[in-house]
Amino acid sequence: MAKIKIMPCLDMREGRVVKGVHFVDIADAGDPVECAKAYCAAGADELALLDITATVEKRATLADVVKRVAEVCTVPFTVGGGINSVEAAGVVLKAGANKISTSSAAFRNPQLIPDLIKEFGVDAVTVAIDVDVNPALPSGYEVYIDGGRTATGFDAVEFAKKVDGYGIKTILPTSKAGDGAKTGYDLPVIKAMHDVCNAEIVASGGAGKLEHFAEAAEAGATVLLAASVFHFHMIDIPELKRYLADRNFDVAL
């Protein structure tokens, strides 16, 4: 059984950690540096920072925030939002990120994926895919871009297969319906992508209670990403890891 990793996500807007529901209704959740320090101390295995408005505002990711977070972060640290070129990725990695995550740009220009891998190595590149339900598509899921604002008409699982074909090691699907709703991860999309991809699948969007994390791991996710439940102290990381370990999942305690 693969080791299960816990990944708090810092959704950023205007230099602050925020959290929304279904990608909107945004609430402030704190200072990114303080959040990062707290999560690392609590036993997070990885950390994500997502600049949620960089793409739609057509600007670069907040490199100064990345630098400040990187200075206190003691675990692998992924940054996404506005990564639309090799140059933009280089700025973020130079600022201290270990990995970058690209989403809308990778959909619009899939050649960006091998270009990033060639420049920075496959371990430094994650492809994120925002998805929502669309029964008209073969998998029942559609790719959304621009922070979940724009439907593409493209099947999400087919796109994951295409991404996987580039040799990418990490795919991060986020359920638009589940985002911030705390009703559980979208298990069918996790399982569908796990079944057709060699890449590890990050579960994202919908965690609300301990059982949801175990369900996602059972569906095939090896990285369990969450935001609201950690930011607002509904679940703490040591408690979550003990819960998973008690159910025979391999976690670093």
Located regions from the model:
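Glycine-rich, proline-tolerant flexible connector loops at the mouths of alpha/beta enzymes
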Residues: 46-65, 104, 172-183
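Conserved, mostly hydrophobic/aromatic
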Residues: 11, 39, 47, 79, ...
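Charged helix-capping and loop-helix junction motifs
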Residues: 60-67, 110, 152-157, 183-191
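Glycine/small-residue-rich loop that forms an oxyanion/phosphate-binding "nest" at active or ligand-binding sites
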Residues: 53, 61-122
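Conserved anion-binding
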Residues: 12-14, 18-19, 93, 97-173, ...
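Hydrophobic faces of well-ordered beta-strands that scaffold small-molecule active sites
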Residues: 5-10, 19, 47-49, 77-81, ...
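C-terminal helical cap(s) of enzyme catalytic domains, especially alpha/beta-barrels
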Residues: 112-120, 214-253
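Catalytic cores of alpha/beta
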Residues: 73, 77-100, 188-224
